[in-house]
């Protein structure tokens, strides 16, 4: 039975990095991700579960988001969503088998969101059931993935209304969830959108940003793993942009730490299930105080 022509998860992402060795160490020792190096000189992979990979790390002259890969259920949904994008005036390119195989999927199309973020839509990812996830450091549990995808991202947008329209077309639901008073008397608004049970998979606001990617959130099943990750950041004197705290929207206990590429990683635990009813907040439940400024999140959240 054909399902709705809509995105169902953030399946994979690509990042460009200047220092691949630093990223290998960071991914394994700080976060507990598995590094998979198959001998390709320009890239390696990060695993979180049975998928061949969830993150592709490209060796580059830049440190930023390379692309986001959004999954649809199958070929009928892939074709229908592609037609929806064309009918709405968006430019897409359906890739050949060579490009699809490079991403290790059965079907692939490429486009851009209104903020210029490279956006890929795919179906049929490679799942390696004979190769279980082997964390880069001991974990008490695992990462929350499955039908919730790999995590969530906040990306740069210059036109929030256009971004909301684009992601709504892809099947996302959501709107403004934070209205944060600023010292200058203005109010920062952040929009959060979901496509599955994860509270949100994409978020954005009309804020200036040096990079496409502000942060990536990865969720642990066990609080012990979040605590150890936080301890490792402190022990290794890695910048913590926002201290431990609990968000009002997704109820997750998280902190925000710097990656070797200068954008933020948000390790978390116990995220809430998405709701369809719209509501907004003016701050967090507790914590998330600014510790290391300059990472694009210098706002008072509690």
From Swiss-Prot:
InterPro entries: Glyas_Bleomycin-R_OHBP_Dase, Glyas_Fos-R_dOase_dom, VOC, Xdiol_ring_cleave_dOase_1/2. Optimum pH is 6.5. Fe cation binds at residues 152, 215, 266. Pfam families: BphC_D1, Glyoxalase. Substrate binds at residues 152, 199-200, 215, 256. GO terms for biological process: naphthalene catabolic process. Keywords: Aromatic hydrocarbons catabolism, Dioxygenase, Iron, Metal-binding, Oxidoreductase, Plasmid, Repeat. It catalyses: naphthalene-1,2-diol + O2 = 2-hydroxychromene-2-carboxylate + H(+). GO terms for molecular function: 1,2-dihydroxynaphthalene dioxygenase activity; ferrous iron binding; oxidoreductase activity, acting on single donors with incorporation of molecular oxygen, incorporation of two atoms of oxygen. Inhibited by bathophenanthroline sulfonate, o-phenanthroline, 8-hydroxyquinoline, 2,2'-dipyridyl and p-chlormercuribenzoate. Also inhibited by Hg(2+), Cu(2+), Co(2+) and Fe(3+) ions. Its cofactor is Fe(2+). Its EC number is 1.13.11.56. Residues 9-124, 149-270 form the VOC domain. Pathway: Aromatic compound metabolism; naphthalene degradation. Involved in the naphthalene catabolic pathway. Catalyzes the meta-cleavage of 1,2-dihydroxynaphthalene (1,2-DHN) to yield 2-hydroxychromene-2-carboxylic acid. Can also cleave 3-methylcatechol and 4-methylcatechol. Belongs to the extradiol ring-cleavage dioxygenase family. This is 1,2-dihydroxynaphthalene dioxygenase.
